[in-house]
Amino acid sequence: MQLNLKNQSFCLLLSTLLGILCLSIWTLQVLQTSYAAASVSENAGIKKVVILNFDDGRKTQFTQAKPILDNYGYKATFYVVCQYPDNKKGYMNWTELETLHKEGYDIGSHTNNHADLSHASKNSLEYQIGKSKECLEQHGINATSFAYPFDRGWDNKTVVNVVSKYYDLARTASSPVTFLHCDGWVHQSNQTDCRTYTKNGNLNYANRYSIRGWSHDQSRQINSYSDDQLLRRFIQVVNTQNKYNENGTINAIPIVIYHSAGDKDLVDYNTSPILFDEEMKYLHDNNFQVLTMKNLAFDKETNDLFLK
């Protein structure tokens, strides 16, 4: 069968169009592959780290959160109210805390009675801050860091003077990240290092006794987040560091603060084990390095924080 001229022209046109279509598809695939490779390359220099904290010493931190941490091979810092173990329902006992310590978890002080330190007397400060360290030492725990209850006292010179007598570092809240050089607080301070005091003897806004973290449960309480919303916010917070950490250099670290972990009597200040597992899985699947406050230290020569 012979094709007439019109049919030959049509076939030629069809072949040309098919060739262009195939070339376009191939080009699109190449561009997509190149874009994906560029994205991986762009993020390859970002080393992601996160520090996990648990405040108050609730029993569910041991019974619900610890097995999940163990499953992923992660450790965390537990800030303990020293008069609660064996004395207050719903909180860990000393056997559980000593188990955490023996298994490599970090234990810090959260005062003796979860006291508001902002208006405490000097005697009360010594009891809440110094005696809580002594209390932990009696159970074989050398606490090197401290956490302020209610996020209060970190900006009080009298309080900080007592904290600095007993601890290397102290943590408060109110920020998604803490800056290792204390130079990221452009709206609060023009400081370029982490000295505790200014030349005039006043407290610097950021220093090793006001290390900032993000309160996971308070964020839920303030914003009435569902679990899905809180997971999305968690992902945003732990990735806040990306714009500060480039080429493998760590300048900013997110510190995530948890409280309850599945307590049935707490609704809006609580993290369910399901949500906690999802968050730990996200860290695992995205190659985060999970650390404790024990990994954070202060260089007295440069007046900066650094990771050990």
Language model region names:
Residues 48-50, 70-193, 204-217, 250-263, ...:
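Metal-dependent polysaccharide deacetylase catalytic core of the NodB/CE4 family, i.e.
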Residues 24-41:
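Sec-dependent signal peptide cleavage junction
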Residues 39-63, 258-260:
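Boundary/entry segment of secreted carbohydrate-active catalytic domains
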Residues 214-291:
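Catalytic grooves of carbohydrate-active enzymes
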Residues 15-26:
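Hydrophobic membrane-insertion alpha-helices, especially the h-region
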Residues 62, 93, 125, 129, ...:
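Aromatic/hydrophobic pocket-lining residues that form the small-molecule binding cavity
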Residues 180-212, 221-225, 231-239, 243-245:
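Charged, glycine/proline-rich intrinsically disordered loops and linkers
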